[in-house]
A protein has these predicted regions:
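Formylglycine-dependent sulfatase
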Residues: 1-427, 432, 436-500
Length: 500
């Protein structure tokens, strides 16, 4: 590495299911993703990798390195919402910038609607992207969307902002340029705009021999998918717009990998590919696919398990499959370790200065670098906490075992988002090695007998959760999770808060 620090390129799709990548499903879906597969061929593919249950939570978990219950960013961010990334929470970009990196984010953000939430207020030098999920962006084009003559300030107060291009200023402020709305037509090719901007950023840093951290977040494959005319039908007959656009998404990944090759940066760059959460299957056929139970916004594996691939030539062995538990939380510590900072978690826990600001936070991630490089054969993470979008702990995994405390009993459709979780008086137990798809409780004649035999796990599980959550006493949630209902607004009115 010429400057002693690897470049870091993080590529994320949106709501992409494990089955949608042919390195996982081997053509089962009727098309292939050779460019994304290349990352797996030249690096590591994970089988037990955890995102979060929805867009905002997954992105916050990655960039902040904290369980979303700490940041309060568990609920999908909507236009006009007040909740977003707070200045007290550092990001990977904040830390890498303090250690000499140029930082750029391109594509979907979804970490807050307001100026203070934008990436260029949270460690990024440059941002060009949109702020929400695609279906929210196209709402103003609906025939019955509120019009100015009836609701004069509705669009301004509650509608989506445009695609923003922003730059961080040296004095801590930012410059913001609104490039216009993300219309249905623009959705067909907006990822190409983001890719072009990311390419310019990478080329510029390559010319100046500056290490870079780039987070390239495509808008695809979130629903609703708008495929450009030239791509329609390219997945083959009897396929779908979703599959046609997955091929475009794969081509975009191929283009940015080819750029690294062209610039001679491939050997010096960590490339990490993933997505935010499990697929939103209730919008099928405009939806991702997973073999796991459930989907986005549930407590089941299908809501949390996501594809994940990472490549670092010469450091990470090629064609490796890892079965250990790894999560989005782990990349803050892992990427800083790769950049030569092995103790970032300890520094932040004690309180440390980054770019002139002192931060004191509890990182929930583990340094996975020795596991990735083959120095150790086991992941340092042996557990995962499943937090839903209300900020509640619905389940915990420890090694093989998963205990479900709250379950979503709706099988699918948007009822998954509307119906409450059911609190179980006795938690359900699953063995995620013998029953990885969590089907035993509704397919096995002997499940309840088996569970009764394993009731010895329940009290230790409670003790484990209490032990792991003890850090919340010193580092409590930064803000209360948002809600789609009216309870928070009513509570604020009763308290006399002006933001109500």
């Amino acid at each position: 590495v010429p400057h002693g620090k690897p470049n870091i390129l993080v590529i994320w799709g949106d709501d992409i299911g494990i089955s949608n990548l042919s390195c996982y499903s081997d053509g089962l879906m009727g098309y292939r993703t050779p460019n994304i597969d290349r990352i797996a061929d030249e690096g590591v593919r994970f089988t037990d990798y955890y995102g979060e249950q929805s867009c905002t939570a997954g992105r916050a978990a990655f960039i902040c390195g904290q369980n979303p219950a700490r940041t309060g960013l568990t609920k999908v961010g909507l236009p006009g919402a007040e909740l977003g990334l707070l200045p007290e929470d550092p990001t990977i970009a904040t830390a890498l910038k303090a250690h000499g990196y140029a930082t750029g984010q391109f594509g979907k953000n979804h970490l807050g609607d307001r100026d203070e939430h934008l990436p260029t207020m949270h460690g990024f030098d440059e941002f060009f992207g949109n702020l929400y999920h695609l279906n929210a962006e196209e709402e103003p084009e609906l025939e019955d969307y509120p019009q100015p003559e009836d609701f004069p300030n509705f669009r301004q107060n509650f509608g989506p902002r445009g695609v923003l291009h922003t730059w961080a200023n040296a004095d801590g402020t930012q410059r913001i340029e609104d490039t216009g709305p993300l219309t249905r037509m623009r959705m067909e090719t907006v990822d190409e705009e983001f890719l072009d901007a990311a390419a310019v950023f990478i080329k510029d840093k390559a010319e100046s021999a500056t290490p870079f951290f780039v987070w390239f977040n495509t808008t695809h494959m979130h629903f609703r998918t708008h495929v450009k005319p030239a791509s329609k039908g390219q997945a083959g007959r009897w396929q779908s717009d979703y599959h046609d656009t997955m091929i475009d998404h794969d081509l975009h990944v191929g283009q940015i990998l080819a750029l690294l090759d062209e610039l001679g940066l491939a050997e010096d760059t960590i490339v990490f590919y993933s997505t935010d959460n499990g697929p939103h299957m209730n919008s099928w056929p405009d939806a991702g696919m997973t073999p796991f139970r459930g989907e986005k916004n549930t407590n089941w594996e299908g809501g949390y398990r996501v594809p994940a691939l990472v490549r670092w030539p010469g450091r990470i062995p090629a064609r490796t499959v890892l079965n250990g538990i790894v999560s989005h939380n782990d990349w803050f510590t892992t990427l800083l370790a790769a950049a030569g900072v092995d103790d970032i978690a300890a520094q932040l826990k004690a309180g440390t200065e980054l770019n002139g600001t002192t931060y004191k936070v509890h990182l929930d991630g583990h340094n996975q670098l020795p596991y990735l490089t083959g120095e150790t054969d086991a992941s340092p993470r042996n557990f995962f906490f499943y937090v839903n979008d209300d900020g509640d702990l619905t389940a915990v995994r420890y090694d093989n075992w998963k205990m479900v405390f709250l379950e979503q009993r709706v099988r699918g459709t948007m009822q998954v988002w509307a119906e409450p979780f059911t609190e179980l008086r006795v938690p359900k137990i699953f063995n995620l090695r013998t029953d990885p798809y969590e089907r035993a409780d509704f397919t096995s004649n002997t499940y309840w007998d088996w569970m009764l035999d394993h009731a010895f796990l329940l009290v230790p599980a409670q003790a484990f959760v209490a032990q792991m959550l003890a850090s919340f006493l010193e580092f409590p949630p930064r803000q209360e999770a948002a809600t789609f209902g009216i309870k928070q607004a009513l509570d604020k009115l009763r308290a006399g808060l002006p933001s109500a």
